[in-house]
Swiss-Prot record:
InterPro entries: ScpB_csome_segregation, WH-like_DNA-bd_sf, WH_DNA-bd_sf. It comes from Streptococcus equi subsp. zooepidemicus (strain H70). GO terms for biological process: cell division; chromosome separation; DNA replication. This is Segregation and condensation protein B. It is found in: Cytoplasm. It comes from the Bacteria. The keyword Cell cycle applies. Participates in chromosomal partition during cell division. May act via the formation of a condensin-like complex containing Smc and ScpA that pull DNA away from mid-cell into both cell halves.
Length: 179
């Protein structure tokens, strides 16, 4: 496996949070100079590939994979899609976690699920079921997420206390490996 493919995989899994140069150096065990060469190579790969919808950006000293700007109108239309579309299993999982654990950060959601949740979380925000609810007072000040009044309406309840008590739900332990 090449450093380029490892770099791409790490940035994909990091999602909207991205990864700093220091984190990438540590994870890939490369020198900063060698890593910068790989970042430049990946950036060039995306620029030249007209079939790819992604590009590599550096924002606030953090590297992220994002969609190309020319796709913004399509993605805005997607984000405005009516809620009557069925929510994916991932979106339902994230919505459940936010409902029961709010306020909660995306990283905390990821830790519970064991996979990156940024896509599902973005979809829930776009649908108006979840909203940013401040910043957590820790290093990096990540966004906190909570459900909205629309979530309550959508679920047909008036208060979060009306949600089913999760301790009464039998959970089937299942171990899975993502990688």
């Amino acid at each position: 496996m090449t450093y380029l493919s490892q770099l791409e995989a790490l940035l994909f899994v990091a999602g909207e949070e991205g990864l700093s140069l220091r984190q990438l150096v540590s994870l890939l065990e490369l020198t900063p100079t060698a890593l910068q060469q790989q970042l430049d190579k990946l950036s060039q790969k995306y620029k030249e590939d007209k079939e790819s919808g992604l590009c590599l950006i550096e924002s606030s000293r953090t590297y992220k994979l994002v969609t190309k700007e020319c796709l913004a109108p399509l993605l805005k239309d997607y984000a405005k899609a009516p809620i009557n579309q069925t929510l994916s299993r991932a979106s339902l999982e994230v919505l459940s976690i936010v409902a029961y654990k709010q306020p909660i950060t995306r990283i905390e959601i990821d830790e519970i699920r064991g996979v990156n949740s940024s896509g599902a979380l973005s979809k829930l925000v776009a649908f108006g079921l979840v909203q940013e609810a401040g910043k957590k007072e820790v290093i990096g000040r990540p966004n906190l997420y909570a459900t909205t009044d629309y979530f309550l309406d959508y679920m047909g309840i008036n208060h979060l206390e009306e949600l089913v008590d999760i301790s009464s739900i039998a959970v089937e332990e299942q171990e899975t490996t993502l990688f």
